[in-house]
Amino acid sequence: MKAESLEQAYELNQKRTACVLGGMVWLKMGNRIVTTAIDLSGLGLDTITETESEFVIGCMTPLRDLELHQGLHTYTKGAIRESLRHIVGVQFRNCATVGGSIWGRFGFSDVLTMLLALDTEVELFKGGRVCLSDFVKMPKDRDILVRIIIKKTPLKVVYLSQRNSKTDFPVLACCIRLSENGVRAVYGARPAKAFLLEDEEGLL
C-alpha cells in the first residue's frame, strides 16, 4: 500500500505482519510473512538537504545518491564514497536505501560503520531524534525511521575495509574519525553489528 502520509504509514505498521518497504534488496532474501507492505516512496523522503550545520537525508534516499553527493564527499574527505563504492554494484546501490540499511542494523553494514563515526542522529516518527549510537542498541519496534541527520562537526575521517573479493561483504570494516573531542573508532563486520569505541582516556 502506498502511504499518503507518515501518520498513515505508522498506523499500518502497527500490525505484526506489516512491513515498511525500502529498496527491498535485503527483504526479498528473507522468508517472513508480510500481509501489508507499506510504500513510502510518495512522501518525498528520497532527498539530501545540506545546510550550514548539517546534512538531512531522507530514509528513501538510495545509497548511490550518498555516494555521488559532492557535499558529503567534501565533508568526509572521500570517506563516505569509499565506504559505499564496494557495496555489490551500481544497480544495487541505486535500489538499496539508507533508511533500510540503518534500520536493519546489519552486522555487515558499511553504511552503519561509516555513519556511526560521524555525529549522526536518526529521526523516528514517534521517537523523535535519537543519537545513532543509541539507536543501534535499541530493540526493533514498530516505529518508522524518517530521516538521518549528520551534523557538520569539523573532523578528519578515514574508512577502510577488507574483503575477500571486490564486491563481497567486508570481512572487517573500520572507520576512524579525529575531531576536537578526540578520536572515535568504529569496527564493523565482526560479524556482529558495528561497535563504537570512544577514546575517553585519550590513549589515541
Predicted regions and their residues:
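C-terminal structural segment of proteins
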Residues: 1-204
